[in-house]
Amino acid sequence: MTTVIDATMAYRFLEEATDSSSSSSSSKLESSPVDAVLFVGMSLVLGIASRHLLRGTRVPYTVALLVIGIALGSLEYGAKHNLGKIGHGIRIWNEIDPELLLAVFLPALLFESSFSMEVHQIKRCLGQMVLLAVPGVLISTACLGSLVKVTFPYEWDWKTSLLLGGLLSATDPVAVVALLKELGASKKLSTIIEGESLMNDGTAIVVFQLFLKMAMGQNSDWSSIIKFLLKVALGAVGIGLAFGIASVIWLKFIFNDTVIEITLTIAVSYFAYYTAQEWAGASGVLTVMTLGMFYAAFARTAFKGDSQKSLHHFWEMVAYIANTLIFILSGVVIAEGILDSDKIAYQGNSWRFLFLLYVYIQLSRVVVVGVLYPLLCRFGYGLDWKESIILVWSGLRGAVALALSLSVKQSSGNSHISKETGTLFLFFTGGIVFLTLIVNGSTTQFVLRLLRMDILPAPKKRILEYTKYEMLNKALRAFQDLGDDEELGPADWPTVESYISSLKGSEGELVHHPHNGSKIGSLDPKSLKDIRMRFLNGVQATYWEMLDEGRISEVTANILMQSVDEALDQVSTTLCDWRGLKPHVNFPNYYNFLHSKVVPRKLVTYFAVERLESACYISAAFLRAHTIARQQLYDFLGESNIGSIVINESEKEGEEAKKFLEKVRSSFPQVLRVVKTKQVTYSVLNHLLGYIENLEKVGLLEEKEIAHLHDAVQTGLKKLLRNPPIVKLPKLSDMITSHPLSVALPPAFCEPLKHSKKEPMKLRGVTLYKEGSKPTGVWLIFDGIVKWKSKILSNNHSLHPTFSHGSTLGLYEVLTGKPYLCDLITDSMVLCFFIDSEKILSLQSDSTIDDFLWQESALVLLKLLRPQIFESVAMQELRALVSTESSKLTTYVTGESIEIDCNSIGLLLEGFVKPVGIKEELISSPAALSPSNGNQSFHNSSEASGIMRVSFSQQATQYIVETRARAIIFNIGAFGADRTLHRRPSSLTPPRSSSSDQLQRSFRKEHRGLMSWPENIYAKQQQEINKTTLSLSERAMQLSIFGSMVNVYRRSVSFGGIYNNKLQDNLLYKKLPLNPAQGLVSAKSESSIVTKKQLETRKHACQLPLKGESSTRQNTMVESSDEEDEDEGIVVRIDSPSKIVFRNDL
């Protein structure tokens, strides 16, 4: 405000120094600094009116503003009666300091322009930009300076002539950018012209400052000139990068505060400009340009969702206001420079030199483009002759040149630059700005049309017509649904049609199918290129959506989007966006150091996990984005040859991503688990935010309550962002405590194990024990996958024989003293612990612990002896089978019988038995005892020898005990042998679209519980549960499922099938109705490595009669609301609970 007041005081001083009429004196007395605000408001109103009236015409908006400004200036400075208060405001703004004028408008305009540029296009066009901005400006300055010196009659020296040449060599970014956006030029051409105008504006200012110093009498040698140029240019780049890095780091600490984020961008742009221009003596223009491009490259993904939209709209509004003011003010300055001067007659003689100077400027532009054309064709995207013509014709001049000429006028009136020279500089510059905007700006669209550069290519035209045809079909379907009403009756389709102008062709008729069934499927290379481009745009849009939803981080999003940008430049060949991701998706070389004892394993693990986690995010996001884009392309084009080609290319690229995820899953599954955990956490928190917002809409909660709940969820989101879960090896004591076997181990037994120095981590391919060797101890598996293989066991039906978290391996062999039944080899990174046989056998003195150990050993035998049934069943589910009434462990004496009904299966753990009713042969332990009237699919169909069958698998209804025997009988009728392992549909598959009213109904269904909360039921059921004493098997089941001893009632609410419906429902966990838009990136658990193979196996696996199958689950599913999606997925447990910690635990 001080500056405005000072300008007003200067204005009054000038008025008092001149002879003025009484009317002007009266106006002077009424002048007020507040009149400057009136000019701003009037300019904005005129700008709004111009934009509204000129919409749909060929007159550029900026040209209209310049004409309005000249008209206002002419009325104020040229007419006998001035404009009063408005005139006072015009004079206040007109007398503003040129440097202040640049400092007010340039930072906002330059930052908005450079921030909106696409990074990959900047990279590709950078060589062309630099050529036009540096050599181009120098060539233009030399040409203009030489022509002015030779042909103009003002007896200027070379320094003054070159000063005018440098001043007029800058194509103004404000004018050029505004014009290109309005005309809709191609992206490639817009990037070159816009980037050149940004860069050469800074270069021209530097050249101008250099020649101005020389013209003012400051002699400089070559060393000082080079030093000055390096300081101005390199210093500007360095300051821009410094401010960019500092502000982007600051942005990382701002969470969901759009106002602060936008304010930071404003503050940093102006502060960087001031620091460079006034404090460091560098170029403020180059500084802000560098800052904006740095933001475009590294901070674009920092603004997500509403913040990004708000930022875009804000800077669009700032650019619009600044453009409106600066072009009207430029017109005022031009009018004042021409009319309000004592040298009008002299300038009148200079009009012909003004037009001659305009011709020189066009010729110099032709020389610049012509000389650099061979190099321009070799860099970036290249340049053809049509684009060269547009490049020549788009060399507009604007506010920057005017501000520089004003500074020359202010510096004039001395022995070096006369006052007349300063006035001529302003006159020529204003005239050139007017002519380039009026002539070049108004005719650029005509030139584009003349060169046929505004015509849509045939493929795009066909796509447009096809889209209109599909829009017509959708409009007809919508009319069928909405056109008839019980109360109001039918609607009139012709009237509806008259309002839908978008469905009509150029001749006003409704569009018809444009392809006749074949054109859309033609193999035209241009059409194929266009479809690839649209496909990649869809992939990039999905990346943005995933970033907004928190599925990927900012760094990951930058990598993914850069790969798409690079692929967009090569759409003439097959899809290649995966090629740009390959350097980021691999196992790091230092992963091999995990085998080494030289480098600390924890350090190597930390860096390897960081790299693999990022690679998994990239791969999963790539697969999801391509899946969605393929579906969208298929929905849009249907069955077409050209669509099939692009879809096949996408699927081929996805194979490599799938292979990498499978490799990580088999080698380091903990990484995928952390990725999945983070994404699930974010999705759940977003679901809660949506639920809270819906509560506010329906009015069930008050504003204060909503704010409290919203802050609580935002706290969780902030914690997830700043302290995400990571993979870290847990402490041995924690691992032992969380293992299900620990419930049977006395504290005195566990304490020495917790302080053991043994290394718990085994890499892939390590053999834990070999088949036939003497049992030396038991292996506890805490995390990872262990593969088994055996020569004597008939495991032909086991497609993927593995054990995972919670397994106790070798326990049966230790209890019986028999050799190990199979080889055990780690199939991924495994966290495990070895306990000697003597320590385990010492626990058998307690009968309860002894029974538990036998039950625990039976879990592994089920998978070894009956892989057809139990191979894909997780350990926690088998423990649920053992811990319920579905199993019974019994010790038999000689002569007793063991009966196996049709819905059961038995395991002979100790002793010998003989089957009754068939060939009597001695059966030794271990053996699976199946009923003779059961489904034959459960029996081993391999061509194994008779000894194998006798030893490990028998069929009979009754068995006679020959010696003391121990057996456990399982009732698998409730288990459901025909049940495949249900999984939630992969989130790589795009979610089904659901209307907003369906989502609203699902939310309202959730609200019902708010009105009838069971306040006392928890306490009552808790008292009943506390009275119950859990067996060791039940406690082990809790540890296996939840990772710790838990409140049974609370867990039964979420996993009711385990406690309420016993085993029959423990495989199915009810899924919360999530927002379809909040799908999760797939990160499968280790049990899904061969899901496809498991499903194929079950096609051949027969089923026991399920007489005992309960109808509970059927009743439960029937009672579910019809509002729920019929394809609602199933949430499936991950076999091993994730050992996830937070970074503050490091």
From Swiss-Prot:
GO terms for molecular function: sodium:proton antiporter activity. Residues 981-1001, 1102-1128 are annotated as: Disordered. Residues 50-58, 121-127, 181-191, 251-253, 300-313, 374-387, 442-1146 are cytoplasmic. The chain crosses the membrane at residues 29-49, 59-79, 100-120, 128-148, 160-180, 192-212, 228-250, 254-273, 279-299, 314-334, 353-373, 388-408, 421-441. InterPro entries: Cation/H_exchanger_CPA1, Cation/H_exchanger_TM, cNMP-bd_dom_sf. GO terms for cellular component: chloroplast envelope; plasma membrane. It holds the Pfam family Na_H_Exchanger. Keywords: Antiport, Cell membrane, Ion transport, Membrane, Phosphoprotein, Potassium, Potassium transport, Sodium, Sodium transport, Transmembrane, Transmembrane helix, Transport. Belongs to the monovalent cation:proton antiporter 1 (CPA1) transporter (TC 2.A.36) family. This is Sodium/hydrogen exchanger 7. It comes from Arabidopsis thaliana (Mouse-ear cress). The lineage of its organism: Eukaryota, Viridiplantae, Streptophyta, Embryophyta, Tracheophyta. The gene is NHX7.
